[in-house]
């Protein structure tokens, strides 16, 4: 099978044949407008989360002329997610937790305002409320399986901040959407924020989120806990950003992790990232399955897809997790690649 599994613990059997709901939680971070902590180009960073979910839901981006694409010509991972949605007929519903620009599709709004300034220790002041909104929303979503992704430019920096704030060894271990991972800049930004917010070992998980998290995190934690409490499996579809969500879940409700109903689903590109260590982070949190989908992009006809194998983009918009589900449920990964290749010039025509 084209899945790399660590601590699988029978999780793949739990998602086989299940009828899923895919949701992507989007947010923006004010810090990204002035400090280059994101791999997304500053000219499009305000529009990227909305353009991503528009592509997944509608089949094309509306907020931008084309779907997001990076400097190496690598298309947004939303192209992978769209392929799985289309090929496996997966229902999808998207959630705004503070994107700068709102998507031009139907969506659920949980918070209108973006995440604030991480370096000031002022990410938000309502993380507990956002958690409860995510939790209550999850209780009202009817699906046999939740696959939840994110599109948050700069989100690996907030992931680092939350992991450090909760006491994990995470410096130099979070991934990046770009080939050159600016570890030192990320560490400087979050250390400043943690210090200014007065975070210490007595601080609560919500204190840490309010200081250096992003608004996606408490929302996804609430969604995941609400599903797992009802004995429904959850794929946290993402890389090191979802490891931070996992750490938040552990702080709020450790018992749900012990049920073996929550797993991280990511891409081979994150798991094999030499400048990150998703496996090492998750092992500190608990015995949680980490599942990575393989795509065989080295055989792609499009150079931008081949660049994923060289460290570009890697993950996002739930790509790895929704692909894990799709592959377990009999979709050949070559079909994902072929779908993107067939649609590429339609999506990216000027």
Swiss-Prot record:
For this protein, the parts annotated as crossing the membrane are none
- Output the Gene Ontology terms for molecular function: nicotinate-nucleotide-dimethylbenzimidazole phosphoribosyltransferase activity
Source superkingdom? Archaea
InterPro entries documented for this protein: Nict_dMeBzImd_PRibTrfase, Nict_dMeBzImd_PRibTrfase_arc, Nict_dMeBzImd_PRibTrfase_sf
Tell me the Pfam families matching this sequence.
Answer: DBI_PRT
NCBIfam families in UniProt = nicotinate mononucleotide-dependent phosphoribosyltransferase CobT, PRK04447.1-5, PRK04447.1-7
Q: PANTHER family given for it?
A: PTHR38811, UPF0284 PROTEIN SLL1500
Q: What is this protein called?
A: UPF0284 protein MJ1598
Q: Which organism is it from?
A: Methanocaldococcus jannaschii (strain ATCC 43067 / DSM 2661 / JAL-1 / JCM 10045 / NBRC 100440)
């Amino acid at each position: 099978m084209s899945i790399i599994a660590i601590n699988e613990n029978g999780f793949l059997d739990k998602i086989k044949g299940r009828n899923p709901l895919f949701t992507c939680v989007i947010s923006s971070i004010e810090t990204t407008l002035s400090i280059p902590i994101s791999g997304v180009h500053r000219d499009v960073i305000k529009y990227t989360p909305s353009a991503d979910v528009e592509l997944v839901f509608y089949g094309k981006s509306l907020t931008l002329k084309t779907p997001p694409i990076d400097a190496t010509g690598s298309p947004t991972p939303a192209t992978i997610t769209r392929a799985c949605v289309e090929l496996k007929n997966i229902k999808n519903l998207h959630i705004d937790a503070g994107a700068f620009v709102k998507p031009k599709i139907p969506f659920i709004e949980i918070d209108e305002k973006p995440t604030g300034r991480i370096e000031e220790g002022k990410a938000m002041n309502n993380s507990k409320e956002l958690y409860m909104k995510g939790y209550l929303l999850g209780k009202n979503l009817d699906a046999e399986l939740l696959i939840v992704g994110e599109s948050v430019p700069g989100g690996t920096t907030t992931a680092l901040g939350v992991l450090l704030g909760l006491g994990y060894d995470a410096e130099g271990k979070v991934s990046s959407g770009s080939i050159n991972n600016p570890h030192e800049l990320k560490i400087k930004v979050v250390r400043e924020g943690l210090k200014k917010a007065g975070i210490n070992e007595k601080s609560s998980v919500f204190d840490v989120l309010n200081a250096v998290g992003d608004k996606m995190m408490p929302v996804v934690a609430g969604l995941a806990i609400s599903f797992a409490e009802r004995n429904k499996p959850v794929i946290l579809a993402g890389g090191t950003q979802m490891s931070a969500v996992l750490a938040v879940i552990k702080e709020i409700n450790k018992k749900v992790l012990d049920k073996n109903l929550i797993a991280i689903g990511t891409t081979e590109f994150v798991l094999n990232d030499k400048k990150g260590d998703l496996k090492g982070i998750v092992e500190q949190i608990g015995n949680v399955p980490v599942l990575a989908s393989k795509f065989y992009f080295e055989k792609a006809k499009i150079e931008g897809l081949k660049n994923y194998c060289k460290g570009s983009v890697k993950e996002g918009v739930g790509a790895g997790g929704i692909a894990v589900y799709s592959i377990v449920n009999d979709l050949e990964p070559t079909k994902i690649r072929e779908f993107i290749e067939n649609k590429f010039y339609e999506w990216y025509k000027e």
